[in-house]
Amino acid sequence: MKPKRTILCVDDNEQSLSIRKVMLETRGYRVLAYSDAQQALQRFAEGGVDLVLTDLIMPGFDGSKLIEGIKDISPETPAILLSGKVKIYERETGADVFLAKGMYAPVELLERIRLLLVRKRGPKRAHHRVHAQGPPHHIASA
C-alpha cells in the first residue's frame, strides 16, 4: 500500500479548516490541521510534512511568515497560500502556488496539490534490471 502524503493545513477559521481537512482526508491524504501558524511551524520542524496549505491573513503570525519559516527549514517543501486578498504585492510570499479564496474550485486545489507533490518527488526513474553477470568467464582446463 502506498504511504499517505502528509499535508499541514493552517487556517484561523475553524470552519474553513474543517472543510479542507475532510476534503483532503477523503482523497487519501493525512492532514495535520492547525488554527495557529506558530504552532504549525513548530509541528513542521518535527518533520514528516510533504506539503503546506495555509491561509494568508491570520492574527499575529500570518501565512507568509509561516511559509518563510518553512522554507528556511526545508526549501523544497511545496507551499500553497490561500487568501481573500488578491493584490499583486501579496503574491510575493514564497509560496509555490497562490489561490484566491472563492475563485477556485476544490478540484483545482486538489490538482495543484497533486502536481506539487509529484514535482517534489521528482520524475519517475526508469527501473533498469541490473545483471550481476559480467562478460563470460573462461575456465582453463589443466
Give residue ranges: language-model regions.
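Receiver (REC) domain active-site loop signature in two-component systems and cognate sites
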Residues: 58
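Short amphipathic alpha-helix used as the core "switch/output" element in two-component signaling
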Residues: 42, 64-76
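Active-site residues of response regulator receiver
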Residues: 55
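Short hydrophobic/Thr-rich beta-strand motif most characteristic of the beta2 strand and flanking loop
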Residues: 28-35, 43
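Acidic catalytic/metal-coordinating carboxylates
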Residues: 35-36, 62-65
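Non-catalytic signal-transmission and effector/linker regions of two-component phosphorelay proteins
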Residues: 1-6, 107-142
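Conserved acidic segment of CheY-like receiver
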Residues: 4-15, 20-24, 52
